[in-house]
Amino acid sequence: MSRTSIDAGKLDQAVELLELQESPAGSWTWQSVRPARAQVTLSTDRNLFSQVGIGARGAQLIVRRQAMTLHNALRWGEQHLFLTSIVPEGRLHLRLEAALVTVDTVTVQKDETTVEKTFPGVLTEKYARHAQEWPMSVNELGLVLVTPKPIALRPGTLVKVRGALWEVLVPHELDPYKNEYEIGRTVDL
C-alpha cells in the first residue's frame, strides 16, 4: 500500500459511479449511484479489459476511498469507463485502472422479431476470417461481446447489436466480474 498523499485539488474531474440494475420489465441498464471527483490520466497504452478480444485505450483515476467493486463502472462526461483494477492509494484514496469503451444496447432475440431481454454490452474485435466458396465468397465475422456478470448467454443464442443479428458461439464465463462471448455471423460478399 502506498503512503502517498494526494492533493484534493487534483481531483478536478466529475465522474459518476454506476451500477447495473434490472427493471421490472427485464431490461438491464447502467444507473448512476453517486457523483464523485477524480484525477483522470489518459494513457497511450491499451487496457486489456477483455481476455479474448483486443483492448481499448486506458485511463488511470484517483478517487476518494468509497465502496466500489469491479462490478461497477464509471461515467466521465459521455465516456463509459470499464473498471479493470481497484487498488488502495494511501489511507484516503483508490487508484483505478479503466478501459474507455463504447457501450451498446444488446437485445437477446427469441427469433428474428421477438425480444427476450435487453442489456448493455461492449463489443471488441477478435478477427475476421475469409473463406472462398464456389461460386461466391463469404466473410465469417467474429467479435467478442463483453457483458456484466449477471448477463448469461447460451451458445446458439441470437443477439442483436448495432442493427445486426449475431450468434453466440463460445462463452467465456470464468471471470468473477464479467462474461465474454465470442459472437459471429456470416456475410455473403
Question: Where do the language-model regions lie?
Answer:
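Short, well-ordered beta-strand segments in soluble/periplasmic domains
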Residues: L145-V146
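Loop/turn positions that initiate beta-strands
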Residues: H71, R154-G156
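N-terminal disorder-to-order initiation segments that are Gly/Lys/Arg-biased
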Residues: M1-L70, G77-L141, L174-L189
